[in-house]
């Protein structure tokens, strides 16, 4: 289980000087899907990861050191909160720079063991999410895994949840509002970063 967490630093792009001795978990998804809120819920801290009032405005890569415990043994992992995709109203040139920085970071940051792709459970087949999934698969290494996490599932009824789970069998459904699915997600994160989820 996660017992504590703290903010470490922010980056604009990949920095080889910021190495990590720990496995890392990257949270990706389109703007306003709930990345920061999910990190806060998992770490049981309301304001650990800051949510921007303007979707897509925050374009920093934020790092958090997370201390976990499994069978009385403590260990560290890093959570990485990535900028949201596809929302920011900025110049085309600036957006291209952001995309290039993210592309370089995701491909070169070898300590990332788990990519958590957050998808709004009410909009499951948006082109931006399909493209993001295909993009990650193109450079995924054998020691890395993609996990689809459907957010805001408190907006769905039981039938809709069952249908979604049936269509995406290896996914997790979560709700920050009522904490649904968070324990299962926490277990997967810990097992994957420890190399136990093969």
Curated annotation (Swiss-Prot):
Family listed: Belongs to the TRAFAC class TrmE-Era-EngA-EngB-Septin-like GTPase superfamily. EngB GTPase family.
Role played: Necessary for normal cell division and for the maintenance of normal septation.
Keyword Disulfide bond: no
Superkingdom of this protein's organism: Bacteria
Positions contributing to GTP binding: 29-36, 56-60, 81-84, 151-154, 174-176
CDD domains in the record: YihA_EngB (cd01876)
Protein name per UniProt: Probable GTP-binding protein EngB
Domain spans labelled EngB-type G: 21-195
Residues given in the record as Mg(2+) binding sites: 36, 58
GO biological-process terms attached to the record: division septum assembly
Gene that specifies this protein: engB
Cofactor section: Mg(2+)
GO cellular component: cytosol
Example of a GO MF term: GTP binding
HAMAP family noted in UniProt: GTPase_EngB (MF_00321)
Alphabetical UniProt keywords: Cell cycle, Cell division, GTP-binding, Magnesium, Metal-binding, Nucleotide-binding, Septation
């Amino acid at each position: 289980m996660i017992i504590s967490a703290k903010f470490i630093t922010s980056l604009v792009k990949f920095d080889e000087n910021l190495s990590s001795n720990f496995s890392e978990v990257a949270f990706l998804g389109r703007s306003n899907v709930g990345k920061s809120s999910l990190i806060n819920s998992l770490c049981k801290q309301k304001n650990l990861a800051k949510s921007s009032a303007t979707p897509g405005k925050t374009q920093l890569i934020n790092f958090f050191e997370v201390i976990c415990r499994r069978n009385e043994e403590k260990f560290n992992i890093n959570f990485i909160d990535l900028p949201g995709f596809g929302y920011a109203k900025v110049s085309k040139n600036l957006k291209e720079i952001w995309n290039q920085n993210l592309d370089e970071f995701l491909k070169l940051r070898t300590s990332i063991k788990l990519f958590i792709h957050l998808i709004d459970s009410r909009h499951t087949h948006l082109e931006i999410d399909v493209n993001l999934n295909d993009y990650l698969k193109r450079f995924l290494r054998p020691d890395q895994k993609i996990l689809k996490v459907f957010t805001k599932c408190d907006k769905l009824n039981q039938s809709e949840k069952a249908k979604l789970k049936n269509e995406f069998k290896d996914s997790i459904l979560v709700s920050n509002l009522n904490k649904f699915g968070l324990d299962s997600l926490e277990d997967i994160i810990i097992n994957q970063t420890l190399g136990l989820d093969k």
